[in-house]
A protein has these predicted regions:
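Catalytic phosphate/metal-binding cores of nucleic-acid and nucleotide-processing enzymes, i.e., regions
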Residues: 1-151
């Protein structure tokens, strides 16, 4: 897909992030297992009903990286753009996945997602994510009300 003329949004940021992942599989072989969960999007009623019967669940994050690193058993990324905020169901999913050992975050750009994944991949032993490698251009904070890292 040529993104040159596409309006920038959550989908374009996610496409750019996944393109980066595919391009860096030689450097980080575990990236071959990162994938998008197609829960969102506009669908007609018939398709939505079929997907619901197939197990689509509201709130499940956009991206799953089922590779253990540091003290975590896997990683979930919820992509957002602009002023969009995660839904109640999305926040609930992220908090519950954190409780069972996943690293979870909300990223507002492809760059933020790349930095988070790079830090995650490079964790050693039982290290935790700190956001220390994100640099000055990106802010890493745990949202007070949500209790989830926002990058």
């Amino acid at each position: 897909m040529n993104l040159r003329y596409k309006k920038k949004g959550e989908d374009t940021e996610q496409i750019l992030f996944m393109q980066w992942c595919r391009h860096h599989e030689d450097m980080y072989p575990q990236l071959r297992w990162i994938y998008h969960i197609p829960n969102g999007g506009r669908r007609d009623a018939k398709e939505a009903a079929v997907l619901k019967q197939m197990g689509v669940k509201a709130g499940v994050s956009d991206i799953h990286f089922p590779y253990p690193s540091g003290r975590y058993i896997g990683m979930y990324i919820e992509m957002k753009f602009g002023t969009n905020i995660p839904s109640k169901e999305q926040r609930e999913f992220l908090r519950e996945m954190e409780l069972v050992g996943h690293y979870c975050c909300i990223c507002y750009s492809a760059v933020a997602a790349v930095k988070a994944v790079e830090e995650y991949i490079n964790l050693s032993g039982d290290a935790e994510m700190t956001g220390a490698t994100l640099g000055e251009s990106l802010q890493y904070q745990v949202h007070r009300a949500w209790g989830i890292p926002v990058i």
